[in-house]
Structures are given as C-alpha cells and as structure tokens.
Amino acid sequence: MIHLEGITKSFGSLQVLKGIDLEITQGEVVSIVGPSGAGKTTLLQIMGTLDSPDAGMINIDGTNVSRMKEKELSAFRNKHIGFVFQFHQLLPEFTALENVMIPAFIAGVPTKEASMRAMEILDFMGLKERASHKPNELSGGEKQRVAVARALINQPAVILADEPSGSLDSHNKEELHQLFFDLRNRFGQTFVIVTHDEALAKITDRTIHMVDGNII
C-alpha cells in the first residue's frame, strides 16, 4: 500500500530525514511516535505528497508518485489520500455536510452523489442529525469527526493523520481513536497516525518509533 525507499529531506543544513525505508500494508492502522524534532510530521507530509523528498522513492497504492508533476500530484492526492490534522480546519460559513462534500466537488463528483456519499459517512459517525449545523454549532469532538468524514469522502486508500486527537478531551479522544478502527473495518482504509498519545499508539496494529530522522 505504502512503500518508501531511501527517503531523505533537509532544510538548509539540517537533515530531517536520513534514508527512511518503510512498508505499510493495506488495512493497517499504524502510529508514528517519537520526540519533537524527530521528523514525524515531515515524513507524513512526504508520504502524503504535500512535500517532496530530496532523494528516494514513494509508491502509494501501486503508483510511483516520486516523479509526478504538481498537477498530477494534486489530482492523485485528492483521490487517493485523506488528511486529518489536529485542528479541524472546517470552513465556518458551510454546514457540516457541505464541509464534508468539498473534496468531492474538487474531484468533479456530481452534487447529488457527493451529498448522498457525505450523508452516508456522517450517518455512520452518528452525525446525521448534525449535518445542517455549521462548525460554531458543533462540539470539539463533532468538528473533528466531520473533519474525518471529509477525509473519507473520496474513498481514499490512505488516511494520514497528524496529532488528530491533540486538541480533544479524554472522552472525545477515546471516541475518535475507536472511530479509526471502526472505519478501517468498515471501509478498509489504511491509517497512518503521527501521535504523542501513548494510549492510541498502544492500540494501533504497529508502532513506528522515530529518533533524529531515523526509524529505530
């Protein structure tokens, strides 16, 4: 599903990633842990084609994306990869349903189909009755679940999450963590999660430890 080979990345004189090799299989829920500055977020961004490595090969869902041009990468990213960040980044002027539909619109999905697909996901997440509410009318946990729904709308093969529960209280953290496994079991996606949350790391299928730009 995800194959990285010899990934390096530097910012100026600082080498952040030092030859990363990594294989993640279809349907795995994988956590990436390590101290601040270990290179976790940079690795996730490169994995998600949001940044490019200085050297190395990236293969996602059977496609070598290493040599793709930006326009190709953008289309590939929108179709094959979903992103969840610590802060939900929902657009305040749109309802929960409309926020979830945005990536589908970008992909050219007809409005009716996008709406049906978005409502199905929101229903699965227990948010059907909140679909017409705007972000300021939702709780923190609800907003983050809407953000997860948005990541799922184009049925991507991979979901990449960077500290997805970092801004939530303990109850909402537990609900969100369980949701990742429920979604994997329902839709078959692969999840790669950068986290400092030890409880989440313990329940993932595999934990990848990073220190100083290396996997140990």
From Swiss-Prot:
EC number: 7.6.2.-
MF (Gene Ontology): ATP binding; ATP hydrolysis activity
PROSITE patterns: ABC_TRANSPORTER_1, ABC_TRANSPORTER_2, LOLD
InterPro entries named among the record's database cross-references: AAA+_ATPase, ABC_transporter-like_ATP-bd, ABC_transporter-like_CS, MacB-like_ATP-bd, P-loop_NTPase
A cellular component annotation (GO) from this entry: plasma membrane
Keywords: ATP-binding, Cell inner membrane, Cell membrane, Membrane, Nucleotide-binding, Translocase, Transport
Root EC class: translocase
Cystine residue pairs: none
The protein, known as: Lipoprotein-releasing system ATP-binding protein LolD
Naturally occurring in which organism (per UniProt): Bacteroides fragilis (strain ATCC 25285 / DSM 2151 / CCUG 4856 / JCM 11019 / LMG 10263 / NCTC 9343 / Onslow / VPI 2553 / EN-2)
Gene responsible for this protein: lolD
